[in-house]
Amino acid sequence: MSMIPLLSSVLLALMLFLPSTALAVETGASLFQNNCASCHPNGENIIRRGRTLKMKALTKRGLDSSEAIAQVAREGIGQMSGYADALGEDGDVFVAEWVWQQAQKAWTQG
């Protein structure tokens, strides 16, 4: 009988966590489409070849986490200016987590 409260707690935690995770992914994707995709379609870079959002290019520049990508989204790097104002509060985190997930999947959709 002691398993029921434990299972209920786990189920409640999952129900509370999963919708926010789905919202963060949707928000990150939307922010990327609205602010980044014109220069970075499918993780490419139309301004500077080789400065893509693909895993190999990211890690080569030391951008090996969503936190590092969030900093670039917020503050900019090289020719790219920061987008803190455009992305809004926590937008850098949402878009960076989405970009990091896409890089891990080699930017394949589905």
What are these regions (language model features)?
Residues 1-25, 105-106, 110:
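N-terminal export/targeting leaders of redox proteins
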Residues 26-34:
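Local sequence-structure signature of Cys/Sec-based thiol-disulfide redox active-site neighborhoods
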Residues 47-56, 72-110:
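Axial heme c-ligation environment in periplasmic c-type cytochrome domains
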Residues 20, 24, 69-72, 92:
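Generic hydrophobic secondary-structure packing signal
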Residues 29, 41-71:
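Gly/Gly-Pro-rich "capping" loops immediately C-terminal to redox-active cysteine motifs
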Residues 33-42, 95:
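The canonical Cys-X-X-Cys-His
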Residues 26, 63, 86-90:
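Soluble non-cytosolic domains of exported or imported proteins
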